[in-house]
Amino acid sequence: MSSEETKTFTRAEVAKHNTNKDTWLLIHNNIYDVTAFLNEHPGGEEVLIEQAGKDATENFEDVGHSNDARDMMKKYKIGELVESERTSVAQKSEPTWSTEQQTEESSVKSWLVPLVLCLVATLFYKFFFGGAKQ
């Protein structure tokens, strides 16, 4: 949808579309008509109908949708929220994992923690059970 074609809707207009025959969602100030997607939604149609006509941004992000799901949303976008009713909540991005950092930290923890535990156990045993010969 190009910017000159973008329709705008109010929250009140979106709220009218809250049934399984007419299901609109507001996500990140964008309006999506997901009626045709209800039966295809991997999480079931109930979760979409429950959010129909409402701002579903938080619930959408809490689920942690994949990049494929985010790309798929584009075809259901029918417009945007009017400027005066938009929220300034920044879109959460997918977490970026640094495998290099995790691997380095994990390898240190994987041998350091058991080493310290063995040392503590050895000292405990020697102190309490080894005892000094008298």
Swiss-Prot record:
Membrane topology summary = Single-pass membrane protein
Write down the InterPro entries for this protein, in alphabetical order: Cyt_B5-like_heme/steroid-bd, Cyt_B5-like_heme/steroid_sf, Cyt_B5_heme-BS, Cytochrome_b5
Region spans: Disordered: 86-105
GO terms for biological process, alphabetical: response to oxidative stress; xenobiotic metabolic process
Could you list the residue ranges that cross the membrane?
A: 111-131
Q: Which GO terms describe its cellular component?
A: endomembrane system; endoplasmic reticulum membrane; intracellular membrane-bounded organelle; membrane
Q: What is its main location?
A: endoplasmic reticulum
Checking Pfam families in the record gives: Cyt-b5 (PF00173)
Which residues does the record give as heme binding sites?
H41, H65
Gene Ontology molecular-function annotations: heme binding; metal ion binding
Q: Say yes or no: keyword Cytoplasm present.
A: no
Polar residues bias (residue ranges)? 87-105
Q: Give the subcellular location.
A: Endoplasmic reticulum membrane; Microsome membrane
Q: Which SMART domains match?
A: Cyt-b5
Q: Which UniProt keywords apply?
A: Electron transport, Endoplasmic reticulum, Heme, Iron, Membrane, Metal-binding, Microsome, Transmembrane, Transmembrane helix, Transport
Stretches assigned to the Cytochrome b5 heme-binding domain: 6-82
Q: Does the keyword Manganese apply?
A: no
Kindly give the PROSITE patterns that the UniProt entry links to this protein.
CYTOCHROME_B5_1, CYTOCHROME_B5_2
Describe the task this protein carries out: Cytochrome b5 is a membrane-bound hemoprotein which functions as an electron carrier for several membrane-bound oxygenases.
Name the protein family: Belongs to the cytochrome b5 family.
What is this protein called in UniProt? Cytochrome b5
Query: What species is this protein from?
Result: Drosophila melanogaster
